[in-house]
Amino acid sequence: MSNENRTCSFCGKSKSHAKHLIEGKNAYICDECVANCLEILYEGDNGGTPPENAGGEPEESGKLPTPAEIVANLDDYVIGQGQAKKALAVAVYNHYKRLRHPKADGGVELSKSNILLIGPTGSGKTLLAQSLARKLDVPFVMADATTLTEAGYVGEDVEQIITKLLGKCDFDVEKARHGIVYIDEIDKISRKSDNPSITRDVSGEGVQQALLKLIEGTVASVPPQGGRKHPNQEFINVDTANILFICGGAFAGLEKVIRQRTEKGGIGFGASVHSKDENAGITKLFGIVEPEDLIKFGLIPELIGRLPVIATLEELDEDALINILTEPKNALVKQYQALFGIENVGLEFEEGALRSIARQAMERKTGARGLRSIVERCLLDTMYRLPDLQGLKKVVVGKAVIEEGREPELVFES
């Protein structure tokens, strides 16, 4: 039977008159007949009509973790960033509370509060979003804003974000509708120039407009199993109204915009004089960011309006980077110790080595993201030889290994 001649095997409705026509073995059923079957089944089992959310919003199961419980879980994986964790926890708790109670007392409809994370590279933005999704056990997907393009241009369409989200939950639409999407590098689609006061990049603004529709809530049409779109194709429709969007970026140069607003400089004796090293004040300035600063930076007002929760992350200092190396559940040192442990070999980092690793990461301005490459480089030769080193008991990494490129100390069984 051709596509055009397909009809519902129960009511006879043609494909052109049905919203969806689901194919079975030698039979078809339309969406209306599916709804009628659901109603009949519910009446038979419960002696009444199906609830308002039957066939729609899934019943939520389990206790929703409180903001304090969410923060406690984040503390296991992310060092520091107390204020950002608190802001995220409250926003996420309110979001999923809203999904469980779409209308509050008095019929008040609760709006969605998407989140904007502002912080330096390697400060933990992505890790916070990943840890949130893990704690809540919801589908999670990451997207890079710099790879997105407007519809009609070569590149990744914004709706492909939803395709990826569906893929994370085996194309279960109901699960996807309650997932979390993290869009990284959101600041990179705002402007071309290093000067944040210059007018926005037009193509970047087009991507912002496309993202705006997705974030505020639209029905995205996704090809089955993530294939390419083509005419006469059945699509999976996903309502994005209940998907939580978290956008993040380093926003390099935003501190200049904030400083222009807060410090009224002048000429002569009354002029404001800034030191050459102004990095120390960036975290403090990010903490007082206003929507008008983001607009001047290059984000469109409509997009900022759909990201009402703004959380700022602090720049990580040397002590924080050392803690990141050793304290979290998935700390880098613990990961390498586990790798060496598989070969029944111990691994020890001396305090001086840890401090040198942290110092090098700060000099590279890569934050926590640069720690792994430094550790990997100093252990590369040892890991290469590890399977062939018979009787090796322990590997000790000292300060000289990091700073002078020496070999780690190898301790063999006596």
Curated annotation (Swiss-Prot):
Component of the ClpX-ClpP complex. Forms a hexameric ring that, in the presence of ATP, binds to fourteen ClpP subunits assembled into a disk-like structure with a central cavity, resembling the structure of eukaryotic proteasomes. The lineage of its organism: Bacteria, Pseudomonadati, Pseudomonadota, Betaproteobacteria, Neisseriales. Zn(2+) binds at C8, C11, C30, C33. GO terms for cellular component: HslUV protease complex. The gene is clpX. It comes from the Bacteria. This is ATP-dependent Clp protease ATP-binding subunit ClpX. The keyword Metal-binding applies. The keyword ATP-binding applies. Pfam families: AAA_2 (PF07724), ClpB_D2-small (PF10431), zf-C4_ClpX (PF06689).
